[in-house]
Structures are given as structure tokens and as C-alpha cells.
A protein has these predicted regions:
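Short, basic/glycine-rich phosphate-binding loops at helix/coil junctions
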Residues: 56-66
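Glycine-rich beta-strand-turn "strand-cap" elements at beta-sheet edges
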Residues: 60, 127, 131-137
Length: 150
């Protein structure tokens, strides 16, 4: 995973962030009570596999270059466990993906980079959940807490 992101970033020079799959968010305010609720839910989730589909491109900053992930029952079940927390619900259908680059770059450049990337593994195990403080205005991502899954 990190090798793939290094190749992409070397060519596109995007902001630095850890490889991740966003399940929920954002939260406008993450107070102590909400934080504890998220931690408690996270500790009940067991490791699970996700299915990787292919490299994908778009002309949107935060989905500019990513790995498309299949909407599996395991993934949706894990995501739905957080439905009673106070994150901002999105109006659009959940598009599970692993971002490789944030920013704008022309399609041809991104297509040429895909040719240099290794074939994707069919499955990847999700073995941890992270609570992340994100400031998209200044391209800053800070992991506040990592919870290992059983």
C-alpha cells in the first residue's frame, strides 16, 4: 500500500497523509463524550477484509486518485455501527475508497502513473480504526487515536 502511495506522490507531489479508508465523518465537534462513544463502538468491531476493485481517477480534489473498494456487507456493517454518533451524514451514496493523492492533476498524467503501479491485491485486512483530526483547508491530517481490531 505505502509503495503505491509513494509512487503516486513522487509523481504528483500531493499532501502527505497516511493510507486510509474513510468510514465516517466529518464531525463538527468531537467532545469527550462523543470520543468515548466512538472508542467503545470501535472496540467491538473485529478485523475484516475489504475487496479492492481497481485504481480510479476523478476531477475532485479528495478523490482525484484512489483505489476503488467494493461495498461489502462487512464494510457496511462496520460503518453502520457508528450511525448513532454525531458525524455529518452525507447526502450522496457512500463511495468506499483508499485515497492515494489529494489535489488536482490532469487525467493523462494520472493514467500514465497507473501504468507504473503494481497490480492490486484482491483483498486487504482492516485491522485498525483511527480517529483523525482533519483540516482540509491546510491539508493537515493528525491521527488522534488508533484502535486495533480483534
Amino acid at each position: 500500500k505505502d509503495k503505491i502511495k509513494r509512487i503516486v506522490n513522487k509523481n504528483l507531489k500531493g499532501p502527505n497523509f497516511s493510507i486510509h479508508l474513510t468510514a465516517i465523518g466529518p464531525y463538527l465537534q468531537l467532545d469527550k463524550e462523543e470520543f468515548k462513544k466512538i472508542e467503545k463502538i470501535s472496540k467491538k468491531i473485529k478485523k475484516f477484509k475489504i475487496s479492492l476493485i481497481k485504481y480510479k481517477l476523478s476531477n475532485q480534489k479528495f478523490t482525484s486518485f484512489y483505489v476503488q473498494v467494493k461495498r461489502t456487507k462487512n464494510l457496511i456493517t462496520a460503518k453502520n455501527k457508528f450511525s448513532k454518533t454525531n458525524y455529518i451524514k452525507q447526502n450522496k451514496k457512500y463511495n468506499p475508497h483508499i485515497s492515494l493523492f489529494y489535489g488536482m492533476a490532469d487525467k493523462k498524467t494520472k493514467e500514465n502513473i497507473i501504468k507504473k503501479l503494481p497490480k492490486l491485491n484482491k483483498f486487504v485486512t482492516i485491522d485498525k480504526l483511527c480517529i483523525v483530526d482533519v483540516n482540509e483547508k491546510i491539508n493537515k491530517w493528525k491521527i488522534i487515536k488508533t484502535i486495533k481490531l480483534k
